[in-house]
Amino acid sequence: MGCGNSTATSAGAGQGPAGAAKDVTEESVTEDDKRRNYGGVYVGLPSEAVNMVSSQTKTVRKN
């Protein structure tokens, strides 16, 4: 359950805004995902992912 679930959460995270951060620092984000993703629930987001989301939100508001 843990191994299969980890793969599923990584794929789901890749589809969201974290996907852009993964391309930049794939190794760091994957390690953080394994430590901070429990059952698909984010306990804490990496600062890089938070910055990416903030940038995207600001862009949407301008549009």
Curated annotation (Swiss-Prot):
Pfam families the record matches: OCC1 (PF15506)
Organism: Homo sapiens
Coiled coil: none
Expression by tissue: High expression in placenta, skeletal muscle, kidney and pancreas tissues. Absent or very faint expression in heart, brain, lung and liver. Expressed during adipogenic differentiation of mesenchymal stem cells (at protein level).
Family from the record: Belongs to the OCC1 family.
Identification of the protein by name: Overexpressed in colon carcinoma 1 protein
Classification via InterPro entries: OCC1
Composition bias type Low complexity, residue spans: 1-12
Region of interest (Disordered), residue spans: 1-41
Highest taxon of the lineage: Eukaryota
